[in-house]
């Protein structure tokens, strides 16, 4: 999956 999704997961 995209690395951006990982960052969003941390914030959400």
Curated annotation (Swiss-Prot):
Keyword Secreted appears in the UniProt entry: yes
GO cellular component, one term: extracellular region
Highest rank taxon of the organism: Eukaryota
Subcellular location(s) of the protein: Secreted
Keywords: Amphibian defense peptide, Antibiotic, Antimicrobial, Secreted
Tissue expr: Expressed by the skin glands.
UniProt record, GO biological process: defense response to bacterium
Similarity-based family: Belongs to the frog skin active peptide (FSAP) family. Temporin subfamily.
Role, per record: May act as an antimicrobial peptide. Show low antibacterial activity against Gram-positive bacterium S.aureus (MIC>200 uM). Shows no detectable hemolytic activity towards human erythrocytes.
This protein's name: Ranatuerin-5
Species this chain originates from: Aquarana catesbeiana (American bullfrog)
